[in-house]
Amino acid sequence: MWFSVNKNKKAAIWATGSYLPEKVLSNADLEKMVDTSDEWIVTRTGIKERRIAGPQEYTSLMGAIAAEKAIANAGLSKDQIDCIIFSTAAPDYIFPSSGALAQAHLGIEDVPTFDCQAACTGYLYGLSVAKAYVESGTYNHVLLIAADKLSSFVDYTDRNTCVLFGDGGAACVIGESRPGSLEINRLSLGADGKLGELLSLPAGGSRCPASKETLQSGKHFIAMEGKEVFKHAVRRMETAAKHSIALAGIQEEDIDWFVPHQANERIIDALAKRFEIDESRVFKSVHKYGNTAASSVGIALDELVHTESIKLDDYLLLVAFGGGLSWGAVVLKQV
């Protein structure tokens, strides 16, 4: 699935922002909590540490702080934002939406605000909606926020999952293309609900509401079949990436920067190898932050932008994969 509403109007990312909690949970810390080792974690994931939010650093707040940075970097005032999209898999509440809570924190009044749920692919799904809104002329300045406090749903007695996830938030402002922005080409998105149970949070919704049994059996924690997820992640992201490159009208060798979902260094390296992208052009932060879910790609993009390494006419390939199962890719162009 992809969006391209108005060929005469091109949406672009004007500016980015991100937020990461101060608390660091290292592999050495995890060695004291579960039967694991730094070598075991790094060999399988590439992760050395991750950030963990404090009790008052909830999802909506992390997203709102990232949003404040993005709005400032775009040179806009908050009252110029006319739509807010909040991508998250770990909302503050089932309702009200995390977007509404972030809106209140930002002091932005009366604009449409809603949550987008596509797990770790949420940043790209939200970007597709923002692009459509801008190119259709529905809104002028769309604020996309992606944040997750996954530590609230991690079982820190399960060595297979507790080593993977961290907390954080990212944001960007999308408007009509202007010099210095990152133009958004047509996105390639997909999902396969038949495989949803491979990566899920089993309880807490209407299908399996909270109960004494669900609490005792640990069904409020993230459940994942790692080997199966790995297999589908590489294949689906490769397909989406090829499709997005074709939609952008360029060749694989034209890609200047690869900005993948920061879930596992082995997955990142496998994808980079398939596209023959030089290691110096592959942006990695997974070793520092682990998998921050919907905010993952956004945090990576923000860090890359602030290195000032992106040059005029550079092409950036963003890819993501997450629960659903869901996946997506897009090519951005620096103009």
Swiss-Prot record:
Chief place of localization: cytoplasm
Single GO MF annotation: beta-ketoacyl-acyl-carrier-protein synthase III activity
KW Ribosomal protein (keyword) present: no
Catalytic activity: malonyl-[ACP] + acetyl-CoA + H(+) = 3-oxobutanoyl-[ACP] + CO2 + CoA
GO cellular component labels: cytoplasm
InterPro entries the UniProt entry points to: ACP_syn_III_C (IPR013747), ACP_syn_III_N (IPR013751), FabH (IPR004655), Thiolase-like (IPR016039)
Region spans: ACP-binding: 262-266
GO BP term, example: fatty acid biosynthetic process
Enzyme's top EC category: transferase
Entry note about domains: The last Arg residue of the ACP-binding site is essential for the weak association between ACP/AcpP and FabH.
Quaternary state and interactors: Homodimer.
Function, in words: Catalyzes the condensation reaction of fatty acid synthesis by the addition to an acyl acceptor of two carbons from malonyl-ACP. Catalyzes the first condensation reaction which initiates fatty acid synthesis and may therefore play a role in governing the total rate of fatty acid production. Possesses both acetoacetyl-ACP synthase and acetyl transacylase activities. Its substrate specificity determines the biosynthesis of branched-chain and/or straight-chain of fatty acids.
Record-linked NCBIfam families: fabH (TIGR00747), PRK09352.1 (NF006829)
Protein name stated in the entry: Beta-ketoacyl-[acyl-carrier-protein] synthase III
